[in-house]
Amino acid sequence: MASIEQVGAREILDSRGNPTVEVEVLLEDGSFARAAVPSGASTGEHEAVELRDGGARYGGKGVEKAVEAVLGEIAPAIIGIDATEQRTVDQALLDADGTPDKSRLGANALLGASLAVARAAAESSGLELFRYVGGPNAHVLPVPMMNILNGGAHADTGVDVQEFMVAPIGAPSFKESLRWGAEVYHSLKSVLKEKGLSTGLGDEGGFAPDVAGTKEALDLITIAVNKTGLKLGTDVALALDVAATEFYTDGTGYKFEGKNRTAAEMAAFYAELIDAYPLVSIEDPLDEDDWDGWVALTDQIGNKVQLVGDDLFVTNPERLEEGIVKGAANALLVKVNQIGTLTETLDAVDLAHRNGYKTMMSHRSGETEDTTIADLAVAVGSGQIKTGAPARSERVAKYNQLLRIEENLGDAARYAGEVAFPRFAFEA
């Protein structure tokens, strides 16, 4: 019997030295698993709410209340339920919390329990997590969207765009894509050194030089790619996470690169970029509530580049449904802690795919050694994963898990490559 017998929890540290929640689940048949919850730096207003302690301890960021929520309310709510009935488990979690934004018990407490149950159920079933969640047909390895240059809320520099990513779209396998990305990463380090720029790292392992702006950063990455012998646009494409909500203010608009800009002016800037660089994806190009701007932008350049809603959708099926109806964006960023349970995450992905939206599985800037998102990317066939630079162990843990999954799949493994993206902005 795979019913839940015990649930435990503890406070651990994430990659930024801040507390987070780890949950452990033991089943009646002896199967055991644990899951740790990530945390973001740039968070959407519409995300499910993390429960933090406040006060002086850990600067107010302690999670002892969330741990108490797991032990005191979540455990009694799910003990005795069959762990293989994930939707039943997650509904019990939602019922126990009873709030639309999960603010009473905390999305961090709920998610830890939800993911730990799924891991324990996979263990009980004798299956790898990607196979347990994804079924017999899960076999596509995602393109790693490697954040090799950090700005915005992830770095203390003047660069407004939060992430500059390389995507090894032309690689024949995930293993080779990882090598290509790592080689570009090290090439960029040498380019920065040659130019006398900082090689200090941001939260996600990318370099954080203080360069003049977006185009200058893209030019540096272009040089780095060319130095490796890889072809920009065919072997390696570029992608951005603008995180525009971080520099948007009601009344004044977007304060970007020293100027106040309208949504239309931001759109014109992006149109310039996709004409000049091999950009295949732009995440959060506009504010999370600028629906009119998003619709206009999607109409203007959505046939040339992937437009990813992160803060816009917060992995929430209701927000995504609104975007689909309005015609905003053409892809969904998937962050399990934005919504708080595995079932709701899978529902959001299913809704996206059924409506022709691409999906990109994603980490958070405050990560742990937990590798769940690597398995989920393969399970749901996202074809894209964003989990930082090929450096820092909390990032590399996910990439290494994908290497194991590719090896596990053997000849059945397929690397998503360029077909992961709905269209291209650049032809080499």
From Swiss-Prot:
Enzyme superclass (EC): lyase
Essential cofactor(s): Mg(2+)
Pathway this chain belongs to: Carbohydrate degradation; glycolysis; pyruvate from D-glyceraldehyde 3-phosphate: step 4/5
Cofactor binding description: Binds a second Mg(2+) ion via substrate during catalysis.
Principal location class: cytoplasm
Compartments where found: Cytoplasm; Secreted; Cell surface
InterPro entries from the UniProt entry: Enolase, Enolase-like_C_sf, Enolase-like_N, Enolase_C, Enolase_CS, Enolase_N
Residues that hold Mg(2+) according to the record: 241, 283, 310
GO biological process assignments: glycolytic process
GO cellular component, one term: cell surface
Superkingdom per UniProt: Bacteria
A GO MF label: phosphopyruvate hydratase activity
Keyword Metal-binding among UniProt keywords: yes
Transmembrane region(s): none
Record-annotated active site: 204, 335
Catalytic activity: (2R)-2-phosphoglycerate = phosphoenolpyruvate + H2O
Function: Catalyzes the reversible conversion of 2-phosphoglycerate (2-PG) into phosphoenolpyruvate (PEP). It is essential for the degradation of carbohydrates via glycolysis.
Family: Belongs to the enolase family.
Protein name: Enolase
Source species: Rhodococcus erythropolis (strain PR4 / NBRC 100887)
Gene that encodes the chain: eno
